[in-house]
């Protein structure tokens, strides 16, 4: 008998994501490459044409009613777990809708990392319950423009976590620490909401990227028109 060769169960291929020092360099346009893309997307999101479209999509997502539904036939077995999940969703320091609204920022930047902050459910910890179970304290957004780099494991096949610049509030201002301190957040500690899973890119792909050239031409044309109108108003200079 011919022996059957052993089959490798793990992944042999690579995702093919191009990186340099933890920074993703897939994009050839420097305006759309990290970290400059954050400034580009912020400017685009304020455009009078783009802003209404972004707000419409984000408000539509935020207005969707969220509920816990037990699969048919498992009502009795999962009744207690479903009730616990409902309690967790409504026992945070902020509302569930606030979390959804922040998570929709992936529609602008392509990704939205959200940290999972836990606490034991005691009233002294701010919980509505006093049973000692582990629940959620909050689901804060890890601001996209504070992500300094990504780290991988398994030879680059799986995401290990992200590094975040430590931005500490100082009075009425938010200033970055002088030491450029970074905080590593492991992947198990946050949820990563992405617009595209291509190449397992943690930054996803912003929908604004596809309209960048049209927006660039539009803004340049508006500047040229404004310059022309300004020249017409001032009239022609006459030398005496």
Residue ranges and their predicted role:
Residues 3-48, 59, 83-240:
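Structured, contiguous alpha/beta core segments that scaffold functional sites
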Residues 48-60, 78:
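Beta-strand-enriched accessory nucleic-acid recognition/scaffold domains that flank the catalytic cores
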Residues 66-68:
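Low-complexity, highly charged intrinsically disordered N-terminal segments
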């Amino acid at each position: 008998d011919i022996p059957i060769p052993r089959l490798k169960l793990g992944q042999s291929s690579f995702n093919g994501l191009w990186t340099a020092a933890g920074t993703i360099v897939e994009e050839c346009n420097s305006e759309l490459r990290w970290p400059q893309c954050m400034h580009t997307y912020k400017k685009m999101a304020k455009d009078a044409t783009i802003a209404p479209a972004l707000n419409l999509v984000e408000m539509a997502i935020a207005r969707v009613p969220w509920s816990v539904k037990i699969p048919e036939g498992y009502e009795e077995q999962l009744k207690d777990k479903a009730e616990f999940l409902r309690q967790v969703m409504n026992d945070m320091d902020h509302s569930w809708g606030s979390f959804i609204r922040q998570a929709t920022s992936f529609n602008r930047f392509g990704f939205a990392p959200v940290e999972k902050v836990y606490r034991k459910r005691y009233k002294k910890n701010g919980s509505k319950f006093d049973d000692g179970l582990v629940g959620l304290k909050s689901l804060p957004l890890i601001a996209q423009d504070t992500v300094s780099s990504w780290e991988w494991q398994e030879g680059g096949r799986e995401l290990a976590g992200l590094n975040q610049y430590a931005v500490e509030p100082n009075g009425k201002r938010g200033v970055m620490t002088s030491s450029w301190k970074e905080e590593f957040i492991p992947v198990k500690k946050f949820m990563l909401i992405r617009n595209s899973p291509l190449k397992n890119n943690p930054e996803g792909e912003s929908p604004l990227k596809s309209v960048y050239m049209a927006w660039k031409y539009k803004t340049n044309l508006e500047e040229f028109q404004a310059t022309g109108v300004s020249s017409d108003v001032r009239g022609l200079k006459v030398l005496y």
